[in-house]
């Protein structure tokens, strides 16, 4: 039985019209010639040769469909040899007389059915005749009917041997996982002899003459076998790399950004330029058989040090022990808020406060600066914070604190903010009765009930006397709503945390919230242990923001009982004191410590991923509340709404699993010295260790490691040029850059617009942009159009870009305000190259 020979053909006329004429039996003077085939002369040895004439498909659905059979014909061996090997042509009449009608039916019937021209094998001629226009248009869309050889040359290679190997393997020996680019790369590995260049070829017939007689045809089958073996080895290597990366990342809790960086770095270590070239050398035809016997090679390139850092940095225990740096110093004495400022002066309540609005604060500070010229306070809120932080002042002018109070204080004064009637009041409190107020309005369960009771039961047992409207005076309002200001000049004894956690779904069960609190408590204690000794029953207070009512109380009877009805986010305040003898100083240590807590929680949140997407954010706790001028609402207080209503009461959520008797925990949650940043609840006598530096020494490890692998960016271009050439920028632009720019401008710009650039000056605006101005004036006329009015409002500037240390690319750009020029959008006109060497 004769072997079917595949041949890719082209026509010397419109190919789509030629196909339609052949199918309908119309006279056509055109002819077909061979571009490429899959046989050797010895394969055409029978009396009759069966030819499958094919065309490339524009959008192949798979490897098997890259070229589609158009006609199946039988030719005498001599005619077939002339067509395949000697640039012979087949006339349209020859094809019409010898093509298989059944094969043509199988090829074109699907197209005719889509066009609504369906017919059986005997009516295909009539169908094409009646719908010729649609049929020809469909052929142009389905097949790649190019008339130029340049598409083939640009796609499959510009040299004879590589072109024949790649195109023959692509069309006649389909490999499902290969692309043209892959085959081109493998052809370079397979044969270093590229053959004659194809750049002089101008017609498809010339290209076919070269390809059908090329000696590379004898090597196509061997090349195909090499491609199969090479791709099998590549698949083995890639699967090993993927398996290593996936197994490793499955053990780590990574954010989306960290995950992208980790995968990028892992693949970069395996497939960077040097490693990939070395692997390519090991898998060339000479070495492939030996390499096939070895274990996967590329996966071994993943650096062991990188693996170690990943394994330790993204592990909770090793992260805290290896990557958290603390620096502290012992000092004596260290004073926070005065103790008298945190309690009432009378057993029955009552407080002593100073309050005022921002303008009153400013007026007072101006007066103080006049009377006490050595104090130099800022005459704004910052000055009030500095004044409140004064604990002991030795000056001949005295102490300006008497402007706030005549009471003697043993420490700093707490500064609060309270809102009433859409006004914000700043308060300095010298004696505070809020604990007395809390005892009257918050009812704790009896001590006997607290023995052995579950935390969730205690949470439900606490009763608040809820209020709904703002008070009538500031003195009363600070009982129900106040914010404490963080003072960077004071030591921090209590770690106050603000949790704002987006939740995946609403109506949280109390057990879900309790599990979250347990995770936070464990993470907080792990970090506190780095600072000093911490007991297992160390108190960590949680205050959950009350939910907003979703309906009127009368309509809520039919709704299922749910502890939390929050739908978008869960708000909580978390407060704990630092270990005995430890405090922090300044904003930066608190910020860094909170960042570390966020990371620890993300590393241990595997069981709570259904509650919130922890990995999508930087962490659940706000790190911005420790800056100067930042305040945070006290526990057991309300948020004031837009209309003065009181909402979002911060209620105690009990989480104290290590203690049997939890009544002291409940009582301490009502003590002011346990809830404020700078309040000291322990014996103030004796030296304290002040932590002044907290650092994650490997912070943004993956991001920084990724940046190191990226190409170096030369950002400080102008200083680099001046340093390299030892000359001023102006001299360099006038002597080297502007002559090239002006020559380019002169070649395409009219004489009228060219005159604007006869005398120019240069004004650098940053490290890589230089504005070009006329010698007189600031701007130019539009360089593209003649706008109505023709005002000089166009800015021109040069963008300097260092491609390498000695290769400078200068881009000439302009900005025109006219609508026709897209309203001040920067427009690039041209670029010139300047060699700095």
From Swiss-Prot:
A Pfam family it matches: Herpes_UL52
Site feature (Essential for primase activity) residues: 498, 500
Entry's Gene Ontology molecular function annotations: DNA-directed RNA polymerase activity; zinc ion binding
Protein's cellular compartments: Host nucleus
Zn finger residue spans: CHC2-type: 782-821
Alphabetic keyword roster: DNA replication, Host nucleus, Metal-binding, Transferase, Zinc, Zinc-finger
GO cellular component labels: host cell nucleus
Catalytic activity, EC: 2.7.7.-
GO aspect biological process, one term: bidirectional double-stranded viral DNA replication
Biological function: Essential component of the helicase/primase complex. Unwinds the DNA at the replication forks and generates single-stranded DNA for both leading and lagging strand synthesis. The primase initiates primer synthesis and thereby produces large amount of short RNA primers on the lagging strand that the polymerase elongates using dNTPs.
Subunit structure: Associates with the helicase and the primase-associated factor to form the helicase-primase factor.
Family: Belongs to the herpesviridae DNA primase family.
Name used for this protein in its record: DNA primase
Organism of origin: Alcelaphine herpesvirus 1 (strain C500) (AlHV-1)
Gene field: 56
């Amino acid at each position: 039985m004769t072997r079917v020979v595949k041949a890719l053909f082209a026509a010397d006329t419109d190919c789509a019209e030629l196909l339609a004429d052949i199918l309908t039996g119309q006279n056509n003077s055109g002819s077909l010639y061979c571009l490429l085939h899959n046989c050797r002369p010895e394969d055409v040895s029978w009396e009759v040769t069966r030819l499958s004439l094919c065309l490339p498909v524009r959008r192949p659905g798979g490897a098997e469909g890259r070229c589609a059979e158009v006609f199946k014909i039988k030719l005498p061996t001599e005619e077939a040899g002339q067509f395949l090997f000697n640039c012979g042509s087949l006339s349209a009449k020859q094809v019409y007389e010898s093509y298989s009608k059944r094969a043509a039916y199988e090829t074109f019937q699907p197209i005719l059915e889509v066009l609504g021209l369906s017919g059986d094998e005997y009516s295909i001629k009539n169908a094409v005749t009646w719908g010729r226009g649609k049929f020809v248009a469909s052929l142009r869309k389905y097949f790649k009917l190019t008339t130029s050889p340049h598409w083939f040359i640009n796609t499959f290679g510009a040299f004879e041997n590589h072109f024949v190997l790649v195109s023959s393997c692509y069309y006649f020996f389909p490999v499902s996982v290969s692309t043209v680019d892959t085959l081109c790369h493998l052809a370079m590995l397979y044969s270093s002899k590229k053959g004659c260049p194809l750049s002089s070829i101008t017609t498809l017939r010339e290209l076919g003459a070269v390809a059908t007689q090329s000696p590379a045809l004898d090597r196509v089958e061997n090349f195909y076998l090499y491609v199969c073996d090479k791709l099998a080895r590549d698949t083995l290597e890639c699967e090993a790399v993927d398996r290593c990366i996936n197994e490793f990342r499955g053990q780590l809790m990574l954010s989306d950004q960290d995950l992208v960086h980790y995968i990028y770095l892992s693949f970069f270590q395996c497939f960077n330029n040097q490693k990939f070239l070395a692997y390519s050398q090991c898998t060339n035809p000479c070495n492939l058989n030996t390499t096939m016997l070895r274990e996967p090679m590329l996966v071994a390139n993943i650096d062991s040090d990188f693996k170690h850092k990943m394994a330790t940095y993204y592990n909770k225990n090793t992260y805290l022990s290896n990557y958290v740096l603390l620096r502290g110093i012992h000092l004596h004495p260290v004073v926070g808020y005065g103790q008298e400022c945190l309690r009432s002066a009378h057993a029955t309540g009552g407080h002593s406060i100073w309050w005022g609005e921002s303008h009153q604060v400013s007026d007072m500070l101006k007066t103080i600066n006049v009377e006490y010229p050595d104090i130099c306070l800022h005459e704004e809120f910052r000055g009030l914070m500095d004044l409140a932080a004064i604990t002991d002042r030795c000056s001949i002018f005295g102490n300006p604190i008497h402007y706030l109070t005549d009471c003697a204080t043993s420490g700093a004064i707490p500064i609060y903010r309270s809102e009433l009637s859409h006004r914000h009041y700043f308060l300095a409190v010298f004696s505070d009765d809020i604990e007395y107020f809390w005892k009257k309005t918050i009812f704790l369960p009896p001590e006997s009930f607290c023995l052995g009771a579950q935390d969730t039961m205690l949470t439900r047992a606490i009763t608040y006397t809820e209020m709904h409207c703002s008070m009538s005076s500031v003195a009363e309002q600070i009982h129900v709503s106040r914010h404490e200001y963080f003072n960077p000049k004071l030591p921090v004894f209590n770690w106050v945390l603000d949790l704002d956690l987006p939740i995946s779904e609403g109506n949280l069960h109390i057990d879900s919230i309790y599990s979250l609190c347990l995770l936070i408590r464990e993470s907080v204690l792990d970090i506190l242990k780095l600072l000093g000794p911490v007991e297992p029953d160390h108190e960590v207070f949680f205050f959950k923001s009350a939910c907003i009512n979703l309906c009127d109380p009368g309509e809520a009877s039919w709704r299922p009982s749910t502890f939390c009805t929050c739908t978008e986010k869960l708000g909580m305040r978390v407060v704990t004191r630092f270990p005995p003898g430890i405090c922090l100083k300044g904003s930066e240590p608190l910020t860094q410590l909170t960042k570390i807590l966020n990371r620890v929680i993300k590393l241990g949140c595997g069981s709570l991923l259904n509650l919130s997407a922890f990995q999508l954010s930087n962490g659940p706790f706000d790190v911005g509340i420790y800056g100067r001028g930042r305040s945070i609402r006290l526990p057991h207080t309300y948020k004031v709404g837009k209309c003065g209503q009181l909402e979002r009461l911060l209620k105690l959520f009990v989480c104290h699993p290590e203690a049997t008797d939890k009544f002291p925990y409940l009582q301490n949650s009502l003590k002011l010295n346990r809830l404020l940043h700078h309040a000291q609840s322990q014996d103030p006598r004796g030296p304290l260790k002040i932590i002044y530096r907290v650092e994650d020494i490997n912070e943004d490890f993956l991001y920084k490691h990724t940046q190191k692998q990226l190409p170096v960016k030369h950002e400080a271009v102008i200083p680099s040029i001046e340093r390299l050439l030892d000359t001023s920028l102006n001299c360099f632009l006038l002597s080297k850059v502007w002559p090239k720019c002006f020559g380019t401008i002169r070649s395409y710009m009219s004489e009228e617009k060219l005159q604007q650039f006869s005398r120019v000056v240069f004004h650098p605006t940053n490290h890589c942009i230089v504005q070009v101005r006329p010698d007189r004036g600031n701007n130019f006329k539009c360089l593209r159009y003649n706008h109505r009015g023709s005002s000089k409002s166009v800015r021109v500037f040069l963008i300097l870009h260092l491609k390498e240390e000695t290769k400078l690319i200068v881009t000439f750009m302009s900005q025109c305000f006219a609508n026709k020029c897209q309203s001040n959008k920067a427009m690039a006109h041209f670029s010139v190259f300047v060699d700095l060497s």
